[in-house]
Swiss-Prot record:
GO cellular component: chloroplast
GO MF annotations in UniProt: RNA binding
Subcellular location: Plastid, Chloroplast
Organismal lineage: Eukaryota, Viridiplantae, Streptophyta, Embryophyta, Tracheophyta
UniProt similarity note: Belongs to the intron maturase 2 family. MatK subfamily.
Functional note: Usually encoded in the trnK tRNA gene intron. Probably assists in splicing its own and other chloroplast group II introns.
Protein name: Maturase K
Gene that this polypeptide is encoded by: matK
Pfam families: Intron_maturas2 (PF01348), MatK_N (PF01824)
GO biological-process terms attached to the record: mRNA processing; RNA splicing; tRNA processing
Keywords, sorted A to Z: Chloroplast, mRNA processing, Plastid, RNA-binding, tRNA processing
Length: 508
């Protein structure tokens, strides 16, 4: 670990040039193990201890690199166990280990916080690393004043060579990039790494660390160019063409084309200029909202389609970008069904002896629980059928009664906690009913009894498990003033401890 610290303390330019030797260091794979990203692969290899396993990894890397430079490429077949062995060991197993370690190595040039983590220092919290619930107060503040929104699904597929060439401007170690290119092309047919799609690929979730790094880097590259163009549009004319091209990281600079291209691009940006433009993204979905007219949003849509096609060489389907008017359409974002609706209000005004009513409409940001997709997620998880009728959970029937009740109660509390910002929480009662009755059916199945008998015997206890913290606080504090309690319960509450969407709320 001390050696790893010394490496991280090198100059940034030196780090870029000496990434390759780290692939042969055992502590890299130990570090990948310590992060807990795939412990079973490193530990559950029967017949070998950790040291011998890491030595086999190093031997396998050497063998792969020899094959790579001899142009004697090979592809592992998941159906042929004989072809999947090198040195008498399973190559898929050790290839997974290599990919985990390789992901750690490639991340090093991008990680400026690892030294603080290794030294036990407190990591300074970035403003970008806040709860995802912090997005909604921003939407409440900004979106009622906007007119249109671009609902964008970011492309998941990208050409292999484009990805490697993009990384080349950050990681200047040619050997590491050759090895990355080798992995991407040779393992294109290996389902645990990538999903084959001719010369492009979409990332697989089984290889979490490498998947997250490649996808985040892909999105970062996409956003760095887009956000730069958005921020610089108002004062682009004061930037020289040389600085302009350096900041965008164009890979081929044609001198006689610079002047013409810059002038044309200034005109494009001037057409798309809008001081009331807001951009928000979470995972693979982003929103671009504006106070402008539909013509401006169509120009931005045209820009996105051409940007993806010309820069990433990916054909963009028209259905990946939707233009919606906020007052007439809802959009699905972060598990909520959101919209901007007009709330009528009447104001009584009196002048001298005459009084009259003034009607006024106030724009309000509305967030609803998408009950139909949520029931669909519960159906996939085998808590109910497609119509929303609760069913038992047979796989949990072997657990103790307290564990079964605790699991069902925890699922509802998590969903209720996440959807605490909903404008109308009545839909959550439907979810509570499904989970509560599914729990009762599971217990009845376990004890070979009827649901009625269990609800009669454990009714109050079972109901208590599904009380959320907010309901408990309100019921204790406002026991007599029930109307006040109901009013507080209807209010939206955004929690700042939510860093990811619940799997059931994600509808995937």
């Amino acid at each position: 670990m001390e050696e790893f610290k010394r490496y991280l303390e090198l100059d940034r330019s030196q780090q870029h040039n000496f990434v390759y030797p780290l692939i042969f260091q055992e502590y890299i794979y130990a570090l990948a193990h310590d992060h807990g990203l795939n412990k079973s692969i490193l530990l559950e290899n029967a017949g070998y201890d950790n040291k011998s396993s890491l030595l086999i990894v190093k031997r396998l890397i050497t063998h792969l690199i020899t094959q790579m430079y001899q142009q004697n490429h090979f592809i592992f077949s998941a159906n042929d166990s004989n072809q999947n062995k090198i040195f008498g060991h399973n190559t898929n197993l050790y290839s997974q280990m290599i990919l985990e370690g390789f992901a750690v190595v490639v991340e090093i040039p991008f990680s400026s916080r690892l030294i603080s983590f290794l030294e036990g220092k407190e990591i300074v919290k970035s403003k970008n690393l806040r709860s995802i619930h912090s997005i909604f107060p921003f939407l409440e503040d900004k979106f009622p004043h906007l007119n249109y929104v671009l609902d964008i699904l970011i492309l998941h597929s990208i050409h292999l060579e484009i990805l490697v060439q993009t990384l080349r401007y950050w990681v200047k170690d040619a050997s590491s990039l050759h090895l990355l290119r080798f992995f991407l092309y040779e393992y294109r047919n290996w389902n645990s790494l990538i999903t084959p799609k001719k010369s492009s690929f979409s990332f697989s979730k089984r290889n979490q660390r490498l998947f997250l790094f490649l996808y985040n880097y892909h999105v970062c590259e996409y956003e760095s160019i887009f956000i730069f163009l958005r921020n610089q549009s108002s004062h682009l004319r004061s930037i020289s063409s040389g600085t302009f091209f350096e900041q965008i990281d164009f890979y081929e600079k044609i001198e006689h084309f610079v002047e013409v291209f810059t002038k044309d691009f200034q005109a494009i940006l001037w057409l798309c200029k809008d001081p009331f433009m807001h951009y928000i993204r979470y995972q693979g979905k982003s929103l671009l909202a504006s106070k402008g007219k539909s013509l401006l949003m169509n120009k931005w849509k045209y820009y996105f389609v051409n940007f993806w096609q010309c820069y990433f060489y990916m054909w963009s389907q028209p259905g990946r970008i939707h233009i919606n008017q906020l007052s007439n359409h809802s959009f699905d974002f972060l598990g909520y069904l959101s919209s901007v609706r007009l709330t009528p209000s009447m104001v009584r005004s009196q002048m001298l002896e005459n009084s009259f009513l003034i009607g006024n409409a106030i724009k309000k940001f509305d967030t609803l629980v998408p009950i139909i997709p949520l029931i669909g997620s519960l159906s996939k998880a085998k808590f109910c059928n497609v119509l929303g009728h609760p069913i038992s959970k047979p796989v949990w029937a072997d657990l103790s009664d307290s564990d079964i009740i605790d699991r069902f109660g925890r699922i509802y509390r998590n969903l209720s906690h996440y959807y605490s910002g909903s404008s109308k929480k009545m839909n959550l009662y439907r979810i509570k009913y499904i989970l509560r009755l599914s729990c009762a059916r599971t217990l009845a199945r376990k004890h070979k009894s009827t649901v009625r008998a269990f609800l009669k015997r454990l009714g109050s206890e079972l109901l208590e498990e599904f009380f959320t913290e907010e309901e408990r606080v309100f019921s204790l504090t406002f026991k007599k003033a029930s109307s006040t309690s109901r009013g507080l319960y209807r209010r939206r509450i955004w929690y700042l401890d939510i860093i990811c969407i619940n799997d059931l709320a994600n509808h995937k």
